[in-house]
Amino acid sequence: MERKLALLLILGMVTLASCGLREKHVQKLVALIPNDQLRSILKAVVHKVAKTQFGCPAYEGYCNDHCNDIERKDGECHGFKCKCAKD
C-alpha cells in the first residue's frame, strides 16, 4: 500500500512539474507529506526532474520565461537545460 501511494505521489509531482509549475511550487506540496524517508525521496525526485528542464527543446520561449522568473534575465536552450544570460 505504501509503495502504491509513493508511486502515485511521485507520478503526480512529476506531472505537475512538467506542466509548467516551478520546483518551488511543487516542493510546497512535498512539505505536506510527513517528515520521513519518503519525503526525502520525493524532494530529491522533484529536484532532479525540475533540474532537467524537459520543456527547453519542446517549447519555444520556455528558457526565456524560466530565466525571467528566476534571475530576471534572458535565456536560451542548451541541450536539455536553460542557460541564462550573464551580466
UniProtKB/Swiss-Prot annotation:
Identify the residues that the record assigns to the BetaSPN-type CS-alpha/beta domain, covering every copy: 53-87
Show the disulfide pairing: C56-C77, C63-C82, C67-C84
| This protein's record includes keyword Thylakoid | no
Carries keyword Transmembrane? no
Q: Which UniProt keywords apply?
A: Disulfide bond, Ion channel impairing toxin, Neurotoxin, Potassium channel impairing toxin, Secreted, Signal, Toxin, Voltage-gated potassium channel impairing toxin
User: One GO term of the cellular component aspect?
Assistant: extracellular region
Span of the secretion signal?
1-19
Give the main location: secreted
Summed up, the tissue specificity of this protein is:
Expressed by the venom gland.
Q: Where in the cell? A: Secreted
Query: What GO molecular function annotations does the UniProt record carry, in alphabetical order?
Result: potassium channel regulator activity; toxin activity
Other known facts: It is not known if the sequenced fragment corresponding to the propeptide is the result of the post-translational maturation process, or if it has a biological activity of its own.
Family from the record: Belongs to the long chain scorpion toxin family. Class 1 subfamily.
Q: What is this protein called?
A: Potassium channel toxin TsTXK-beta/Cryptide TyPep-16
Q: Which organism is it from?
A: Tityus serrulatus
